[in-house]
Amino acid sequence: PKALSEIVKDMTADQGLIPTFFNEKGTLYFQISDSILGRDLLMVSRYVQIPANFNAYSNAGSKTSEQLVHFVKKGNKIQLIQKSYSNVAEQTDPIYLSVVQNNFDPILASFEIENSEQGYLIEVTDYFMNDSPGFNVVPSRLKTQYKMGGVDKKRSAIDRVASFPINTEITHTLTYSASKAPRGNNAETLSFQVNHSIIELPRDPMPVRYEDKRVGWFSLGKINYSSQALKSDAYRLARRWRLEPSDMEAYKRGELVPPVKPIVYYLDPATPLKWRPYFRKGIEDWNSAFEKAGFKNAIIAKDAPTPEEDPDFSPEDARFSMVRYVASTTRNATGPSVSDPRTGEIIESDIIWYHN
């Protein structure tokens, strides 16, 4: 096999959760280390830019998919496998074997190992030049409605690659033919720019809280096959922020303490200036509720940094919670979030605020 230095010659290297190599021709390599094999990762896909009149509740910032994945070495290949924690059992329980056998995880992609000098080097160009399994860039219903063809690679590209300590970000543009495109589109073409965040889930999973029907939680559904109920036992975990007292002794004395990690919402740079003070006030008004739970300054509103202040900041980055301001005739607002499928811990949230 070729030497690593020869394969990645003249490519831009970026170290982080998954080291990457990328060049101007659009070739992209991942370097998968032994330490990341088998580790739970969350892949979150979002629109960065979408065509006009595509779908009433789809906009820049909308999530197209959220999937738990891990990398597995199989011979001379690295497989990307989708994982699920929906059906569970104690590993020491005999029924655990049946749970595994009846919940076989799908293989999303398989990559040849081209070099193993400093980890397993795999080319992922084709994977990110397609609407690959799990991306769900265009739902099947809309593909049928707009009579869309496959991805035209000549009019598609990988636009941005960035890797950070706990996440790796890939942005690409995918272009499709569409013989029955949305109104106002005479080109019979639809192009989408999509960002994929691959983020490391917490190594110390948050303690779970079970859903209480008396409280309006968003929740995760699971089925426990090790239950004493003598049947498959369905239950739900509350999706919640991980607020932990920075001073536990003071917290136990009933004093207000700041959390170790406050909830931070960034305002979309597209938010009209005249509304921004009220957006910030509306967000931070929730602090009075958190004070009842013993926390002060638990939730903070900030303006998103400018490119000059932080060139790496991206609204689509799954590390950051955003209030997205959307130029749309749609009314009202929505509040989707991304959570750890193991525990329900909210990783980030994007409030979609429509102009109407």
In which residue ranges do the predicted regions lie?
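Alpha-helix N-cap/helix-initiation motif
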Residues: 272-276
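Solvent-exposed, polar/charged alpha-helical surfaces in well-ordered, non-transmembrane soluble domains
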Residues: 277-284, 288
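Auxiliary tRNA-acceptor-end handling modules of aminoacyl-tRNA synthetases
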Residues: 1-271, 289, 293, 298, ...
